Regions:
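N-terminal, positively charged/glycine-rich alpha-helical extensions of SAM-dependent methyltransferases
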Residues: 1-18, 26, 30
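Conserved alpha-helix/loop element of class I SAM-dependent methyltransferases that forms part
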Residues: 26-43, 60
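Class I SAM-dependent methyltransferase SAM/SAH-binding core
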Residues: 46-50, 54-106
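A short acidic, Gly/Pro-enriched loop at the edge of an enzyme's catalytic core
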Residues: 105-116
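A short SAM/SAH-binding and catalytic strip from SAM-dependent methyltransferases
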Residues: 115-130
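A short glycine-rich, Lys/Arg-flanked "PGG" loop and its adjoining helix->strand segment in the class I
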Residues: 130-145
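Conserved catalytic/acceptor-binding region of the Class I
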Residues: 147-220
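Conserved Class I S-adenosyl-L-methionine
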Residues: 206-284
Length: 284
């Protein structure tokens, strides 16, 4: 997950935010790999990962394309380009992966030069997503595909049995994020992907949603993502001023690892997290 240089997200190119990206990628890995397989991208094809973040999605895409397939990842920040290059350096697919610094709204590529464009958890950060989608369409060959993945965070369940508290936390997070997304929160913008696709001229689009579901005992990837990204970052101290004292105390009791009521060590814990893949084909 990444964004264009003028659209900051989280801690930007910092080490802390690189950790956020990798934790999310690893948490969703089985479902994202399945989504990539279900796309049935042509063997040996050439595609883009716009906003490639730490490079894991680009790697999984390359692995799905066979020995002749190639993936070019774009990131606006040089630091993340270097991280992505290091991330894949030991993979057998490394020779088929390239990472460049670039803006997804102005790709430095010729018209009709690639077979597909993948953009994961990025489009909602771009102030003009229609402009970005039209740029994706420009570089696609006739019959090429635009593929937008969005994590449906507003529909996620991380506090089973505490729906009122979870709704309060989600509303507070939406309010906090409006300073970045403008009048619409990031969560709202995620849900408007088909609207943007339609406005860009992608009249026929397809949706497939994958449910990330984890249960106790949690594996390391799930626990790291839920604890460090959801509980500590998304629902951490930055929301304290947006919640009443009772809600904050309940959040602390359930989400802090040293609390007797800590959820993630309970044998009955589970979580649900929908991930949607929107795709459309460019007319020939």
């Amino acid at each position: 997950m990444a964004q264009h240089p003028q659209h900051h997200h989280g801690a930007g190119g910092s080490t802390e935010y690189r950790g956020v990206l990798e934790r999310m990628n690893r948490f969703q890995e089985p479902e994202v790999r399945q989504a990539i397989a279900d796309l049935q991208l042509p063997m040996g094809s050439y595609g883009l990962d716009v906003g490639c973040g730490v490079g894991l999605y680009a790697l999984w895409l390359a692995e799905a394309l066979g020995p002749q397939g190639r993936v070019l990842g774009f990131e606006p920040q040089a630091e993340r380009v270097a991280v992505a290059q290091r991330q894949v350096s030991d993979s057998p697919a490394a020779g088929r992966l390239e990472f460049r610094q670039g803006d997804g709204t102005a790709l430095p590529l010729a018209d009709q030069s690639c077979d597909w464009v993948w953009c994961s958890d990025v489009l909602h950060h771009i102030p003009d997503p229609v402009l970005a989608l039209k740029e994706f369409m420009r570089v696609l060959r006739p019959g090429g595909r635009v593929i937008i993945k969005e994590s449906q965070v507003a529909q996620a369940l991380f506090l089973p049995g505490y729906p009122d508290l979870e709704r309060q936390l989600q509303r507070a997070e939406m309010a906090f994020n409006r300073h970045e997304a403008g009048p619409r929160s990031i969560q709202e913008r995620r849900q408007r992907t088909p609207e943007s696709m339609h406005q860009a001229g992608l009249q026929t689009w397809h949706l497939r949603t994958y449910m990330v579901q984890r249960q106790a005992p949690l594996d390391a990837a799930a626990r790291a993502y839920i604890q460090h990204t959801v509980f500590e970052r998304n629902w951490g101290p930055r929301l304290r001023g947006l919640l009443d004292s009772r809600a904050w105390q309940e959040r602390t009791a359930l989400c802090e690892a040293d609390s007797p009521q800590y959820l993630l060590t309970r044998p009955d814990y589970y979580c649900l997290y929908p991930v949607s893949v929107f795709s459309a084909t460019v007319d020939g």
